[in-house]
Every structure is written in structure tokens, then in C-alpha cells.
Amino acid sequence: MAAKDIRFGEDARTRMVRGVNVLANAVKATLGPKGRNVVLEKSFGAPTITKDGVSVAKEIELADKFENMGAQMVKEVASRTNDNAGDGTTTATVLAQALIREGAKAVAAGMNPMDLKRGIDQAVKAAVIELKNISKPTTDDKAIAQVGTISANSDESIGNIIAEAMQKVGKEGVITVEEGSGLENELDVVEGMQFDRGYLSPYFINNQQSQSADLDDPFILLHDKKISNVRDLLPVLEGVAKAGKPLLIVAEEVEGEALATLVVNTIRGIVKVVAVKAPGFGDRRKAMLEDMAVLTGGTVISEEVGLALEKATIKDLGRAKKVQVSKENTTIIDGAGDSATIEARVGQIKTQIEDTSSDYDREKLQERVAKLAGGVAVIKVGASTEIEMKEKKARVEDALHATRAAVEEGVVPGGGVALVRALVAVGNLTGANEDQTHGIQIALRAMEAPLREIVANAGEEPSVILNKVKEGTGNYGYNAANGEFGDMVEFGILDPTKVTRSALQNAASIAGLMITTEAMVADAPKKDEPAMPAGGGMGGMGGMDF
């Protein structure tokens, strides 16, 4: 086992705080509408230019191991806030720095670290309750657009496109962000349920212009096994032919004689049929077939529930207003499923989302919710260069997370004003002893830090602006973009409550751990091995003339 380098007490805390300051100073330069850019070197290709706090934090590694530990713990604040709320990483870092810096000073002055931590926790708890009281629900598209705009560093086009996407697919819908091919941002919306499987034979195409198979008011057969024998399909085909409607078959595979017969029937115009493979694999395939059954009001023909394909009737089939099948995708529009059953299914999937620990599973489950609840929107980010594209895409993703958080828990006035207003709830608190009360005071000062930093980045005097904001009430604050005072909601400067709350709670959590740290252990630097002695000359070489 390698030897360890151990630091205690003040020496440990001083080094840790130094690391915190290095990381926080780099990150907080990006805060506010007049925040600066940070350039990140890449091992290959052009450097990345960003105003995204968490992107800056993730790149920082310090040479001194003890300083690096401090930096990594603050990086954890940024990452955890980003995971919880999707935004607010810079605010969380600024809060953590303020709490740690003041806390470390108090410990150096001889105060009890545990009492300081209890005081900070007490203050944060009261502030969170006050934030929830200040919070207003987001109901209209305008508020959603404003939240997106602020999170995307005051880029209105991003805020508006996110609001439009949410309006089209609903608040439960899935919105994804991709790199576009043009200069402008674009929005593509797929309504209904779409899955990535196309027709099994090009002979099913009936719309030559779009090279797709379009079915109006079709029946939908869902089967979880292969179909290769046409006899199994005859009862269903006869029922559909009598009804005079088209048929969509979704099965694990349709092959051989069965596929050939379906193609012949389609060409001759006896029954209009399209066959596609079921999406997904294994258990996920079964779940997606069940989703389709719920959406269309049909039943999955499966031996597991005692249903055989040859015994299936027209009553077991689902219905939809329209189905479009291209070479690569199938879209079911306006399924005939019962809305209460669909809602129950969505609720069931949401429970699975809460229970799962896998990010991949969570993403797939959220996609299933979207397909049942509304649809899928794709925001294609446009830019003129690759570097701008990456920076802009990161901002769009931040803004999207922020708007989701706003829909979830509501919004508070932005620009650091909400935390200043929450001071009212904390100002009257007193701890069980003097050290706890000092911990409360540390939290009070830290909650002013985001506003101070926004003002400092805008080139103004933080104390003067802060005092003027404190004199006001409610939404009254400072718009750093144009230097005006007024109602932050009217200015359109809003922060999601969840983002502000998560930033404060996560910063206090890590700060409490760092203040109460008494020893730090790291690998001792390895001493350089002595160089090998120089080898002697080779014998028998004398007399050679060079």
C-alpha cells in the first residue's frame, strides 16, 4: 500500500478552501446576463467556449491533492444541482463558496464546527420554506418562455422555441435537443405514438409521393410472436375485409408465406394491410406492445394471457384515426384507447421512473410516457460553426431543464432576488447557542452572494445595489442586463423554484461537511527513483579507428 500524506486542522481546511476558491472563481465568472465566457482546452480539436457553470466545473483538476479535494467537493455541488434541477450550477457554486469561506474563518476563530453546521442547516430550512411561499405556479407559455430565456443567457429565441415545443407536446411530452444542419433553430414535432420500425415490404407503399403507407381509420393487430403461417391470420383478415377497413400488423416478425400473402392481398386491393416489426427487445418490447394496446383500445395477442392468434377476433384489435408507416418509422395518430386507462398506464410508468436507478431505463420510460401522453418534439440547434453549435446546444439543454423545473415547482423572481427576500424568514432566527446563531448569520450573508456576483459581473458596486434591493419588497430587484430597478416578473427575469431551492440545499450540505472536516488523507508524492548507473564500454573494441 502506498504511503499517505495526512494534513490536520487548520492546515487541511486552508488548503481545501484554496481549492474551493480556484474552482468557484472560474465558475462564477459566468453568472448573470453580463457573465463572461470561459475557454476550455480540449485534448484534440478546437477549444470549447462556454458560459455553462457545470461544464467549467467538470474540467477543473488541481495539481495539489488537498486543494483538488476541495475543488472536487464543490464540483459535486454543481453536478448534484444539475442532476436534480438541470440548472443553477453557478448559483450553487457561489453559495457553497460563500458558506465554506465564512465557515472556515469561524472555525479558525475557535467556534464549534458542529454548532456552525446546525445553524446553517436551520437557516437553510427556514429559507426553503420561504422560497416555497414566494413561489408562483407557471401556467402560461409566456412564463415558460421567460424562464427558458433567462436560463439560456437571455437568448429569447431559445426561450420561445422551448415554450412552443411544450405547448405542442404537452408538459409530459418528450423534448429532445439535437445538432441541426442550418443556421437557425428548428422545431420538429411528432404527434401521436412513433416508433422506429418501418414497413417489412416496399409493396405496402400506397403514397408514392412520400414513399409511405398511409392507413385511414385502421384496425391494429398486436402480436408478440413471429407470424409465418397465413392460416393463423385468416380469421382476423376475414373480419377486417368484411368491415372494409385497412389493417396494421405489429408483430415480432412477419415472414415467409404470411408476408407473401399479405403483399398479394394488398396489391390486388382485397385488404389494405401493412406489416411492421414490434419495437424494442425482450421485456421492453412486451411493455411497448402493451402501451400500444392501451393507446388503441386493443389487446396484445399473447400466449402468456391465453390468447392464440388463430382464435383472435376483430374485437381484440385496436383502432386509430390514422397510421403512417415510412421506411424507418411508424406513427399511430389519435388511438381509440380509453383516456382513463391511458392515464392509469402513464401513472404506472411514472412509478417505475421513480423506482429505477438506471439513467438509461429512466430515459426510455420517459419516452414511453411521452408517446402515451402527447408526443415528441425535437429542437434542432442551428449555428454557423462547430464551436458555437456545442455552446448553444448546452444552453438549450440548460434552458429545457429549467423550464421543466419551473413547470414542476413554480417560479420565483430571478437575479438573486428570491434568496434576498427569503432572508426575512432567516433574519429572526436564533440558535441554541452563540455558535449556532453565528452559523445562521453565515447563511444570511451567503444568500446575498448570488446577487452580489451578478452585480459585480455587470461592473457595478454590489453593496450599493444590494441595499437598494433590500429596501424594496416582493419582486422588486435589479436587472443587470440594462441597469434598471423594478419588478423582476415584469422584466421577465424568473428562476424556477426547484433550481434555487436545490442550489441552496446542496451548497449547505457540502459546506457543512467541509466545515466539519478535521483531517485530510492523500497519496504521498512518489520520490523519483535514482537513475541507473552508466554501463561500461564493450570489451574487445580497442584499436578500432573511428
Swiss-Prot record:
Forms a cylinder of 14 subunits composed of two heptameric rings stacked back-to-back. Interacts with the co-chaperonin GroES. ATP binds at residues 30-33, 51, 87-91, 415, 479-481, 495. Together with its co-chaperonin GroES, plays an essential role in assisting protein folding. The GroEL-GroES system forms a nano-cage that allows encapsulation of the non-native substrate proteins and provides a physical environment optimized to promote and accelerate protein folding. One of its GO terms (biological process) is protein refolding. Residues 534-546 have a biased composition (Gly residues). InterPro entries: Chaperonin_Cpn60_CS (IPR018370), Cpn60/GroEL (IPR001844), Cpn60/GroEL/TCP-1 (IPR002423), GroEL-like_apical_dom_sf (IPR027409), GROEL-like_equatorial_sf (IPR027413), TCP-1-like_intermed_sf (IPR027410). It is found in: Cytoplasm. The gene is groEL. Transmembrane segments: none annotated. It comes from Xanthomonas campestris pv. campestris (strain B100). It catalyses: ATP + H2O + a folded polypeptide = ADP + phosphate + an unfolded polypeptide. One of its GO terms (molecular function) is unfolded protein binding. Residues 526-546 are annotated as: Disordered. This is Chaperonin GroEL. The lineage of its organism: Bacteria, Pseudomonadati, Pseudomonadota, Gammaproteobacteria, Lysobacterales. Its main location: cytoplasm. The keyword Isomerase applies.
